[in-house]
Amino acid sequence: MPGDPTATAKGNEIPDTLMGYIPWTPELDSGEVCGIPTTFKTRDEWKGKKVVIVSIPGAYTPICHQQHIPPLVKRVDELKAKGVDAVYVIASNDPFVMAAWGNFNNAKDKVVFATDIDLAFSKALGATIDLSAKHFGERTARYALIIDDNKIVDFASDEGDTGKLQNASIDTILTKV
């Protein structure tokens, strides 16, 4: 992961970037409508909140789709019971793909599936991964970020393209919130 290793230091302010998403509505459950993408500014959206942001290299990819995100969605209430106000899953995929994947995972309004537009947020954290050798290009890395009022509480990543899920897993996140 390139970038400044101090960017994710505890107490640092998060990057102020734009993210895209499609707000969940019950109409999306049918799969017959796709919703309308909108954007939010990270510092505005997360001001005054304790938030868990989980980044993945791509929706519907093996580790993300089979091991990482389904347990997170199923256990989101455990995070909320520990004082977490909001949970976001971010990736470089477009808002339509992220919304469809959130719908597939039955996330409804419990977890927001958002697009890290131009990888700006993850790049500012030094948390991207080059998957060009697999024809995916540069992607958001697999990481978990816990913030409180826009300040970093904890950052943990699963380094490289190892296919291993550990530091960004729901089990690990629950020990840190």
Swiss-Prot record:
List each copy of the Thioredoxin domain by range.
Answer: 8-177
Give the first-level EC class, as a single word: oxidoreductase
- What InterPro entries does UniProt report for this protein, alphabetically? PRX5-like, Redoxin, Thioredoxin-like_sf, Thioredoxin_domain
Q: Where is this motif: Microbody targeting signal?
A: 175-177
> Sorted alphabetically, which keywords does the UniProt record give?
Allergen, Antioxidant, Disulfide bond, Oxidoreductase, Peroxidase, Redox-active center
Q: Name one GO biological process term.
A: hydrogen peroxide catabolic process
Q: Which residues form the active site?
A: C64 (cysteine sulfenic acid (-soh) intermediate)
**Enzyme Commission number(s):** 1.11.1.24
Do you know which CDD domains this protein is assigned to? PRX5_like
UniProt cross-references to Pfam families, sorted A to Z: Redoxin (PF08534)
The molecular function GO annotations come to: thioredoxin peroxidase activity
Reactions catalysed: a hydroperoxide + [thioredoxin]-dithiol = an alcohol + [thioredoxin]-disulfide + H2O
- Any one GO cellular component localisation term in the record: mitochondrion
Q: How does it assemble?
A: Homodimer; disulfide-linked, upon oxidation.
Q: Which family does it belong to?
A: Belongs to the peroxiredoxin family. Prx5 subfamily.
| Function noted in UniProt | Thiol-specific peroxidase that catalyzes the reduction of hydrogen peroxide and organic hydroperoxides to water and alcohols, respectively. Plays a role in cell protection against oxidative stress by detoxifying peroxides and as sensor of hydrogen peroxide-mediated signaling events.
The note filed under miscellaneous reads: The active site is a conserved redox-active cysteine residue, the peroxidatic cysteine (C(P)), which makes the nucleophilic attack on the peroxide substrate. The peroxide oxidizes the C(P)-SH to cysteine sulfenic acid (C(P)-SOH), which then reacts with another cysteine residue, the resolving cysteine (C(R)), to form a disulfide bridge. The disulfide is subsequently reduced by an appropriate electron donor to complete the catalytic cycle. In this typical 2-Cys Prx, C(R) is provided by the other dimeric subunit to form an intersubunit disulfide.
User: What is this protein identified as?
Assistant: Putative peroxiredoxin
Task: Please tell me the species this chain comes from.
Answer: Malassezia furfur (Pityriasis versicolor infection agent)
